[in-house]
Amino acid sequence: MKFGMGSAQACPCQVPRAASTTWVPCQICGPRERHGPRTPGGQLPGARRGPGPRRPAPLPARPPGALGSVLRPLRARPGCRPRRPHPAARCLPLRPHRPTRRHRRPGGFPLAWGSPQPAPRPAPGRSSALALAGGAAPGVARAQRPGGSGGRSHPGGPGSPRGGGTVGPGDRGPAAADGGRPQRTVRAAETRGAAAAPPLTLEGPVQSHHGTPALTQGPQSPRDGAQLGACTRPVDVRDSGGRPLPPPDTLASAGDFLCTM
């Protein structure tokens, strides 16, 4: 079959081949085809007339609206060289620029790099009541800091050789409301006061301090919420002296007054 130059078959992929060759769908005409049918408005901006390689239409440099920052990384970048990371990421400072401008309380230890570390925490096996109260064990001399009697060693703090003095009640927040003592000493004093208070008498079912259900109540019917393993024998609390029960693991080890269900 022969076609003239003014034929309606403009796309070369629509031209019928010879019967001996197999038809290969190389470029099928579609709505984004570069050399599609010559219909008004069918060509996209930047379309090519020849059968060259297909490339997408050029996008604007920055699409208007909020989606501009989202669509911009999706564009194909020219393959001249791989993009290097931001140069500011390789120029990070080795230390903070203004270590003394941190928002810190005057009584705290300095946060500048190279300052002495705070005192280590006491061992978990020993009692930390003496450490919290600020006292020393009997027979052990307490080490004096260079800032004076118990003062801070950094300049500007209370008790330091360069001054600093006492801090007003409005400068340190809730810690200065009690005469400037640190919060740890105040909490230790409150703990000692709570330990000296007489114990409360037990009324009603005994309940341990771990929030376990009452141990004197046996399991009722299944409708009343009986649980498997609940104790059916009453607990003998006459020798406890009205004090709260020990932890559940201690109670479970004593089999004389607790069931082993």
UniProtKB/Swiss-Prot annotation:
Any one GO biological process: intrinsic apoptotic signaling pathway in response to endoplasmic reticulum stress
Region span, Disordered: 27-261
Biased composition (Low complexity): 40-50, 64-73, 124-146, 172-197
Feature: compositional bias, Basic residues: 74-87, 95-106
Gly residues composition-biased segments: 147-171
Up-regulation conditions: Up-regulated by TP53.
Gene Ontology CC annotations of this record: mitochondrion
Comp. bias (Pro residues): 53-63
A molecular function (GO) term: ATPase binding
Domain remark in the UniProt entry: Contrary to isoforms 1 and 2, isoforms 3 and 4 do not contain any BH3 motif.
Protein name stated in the entry: Bcl-2-binding component 3, isoforms 3/4
Species in which this protein is naturally found: Homo sapiens
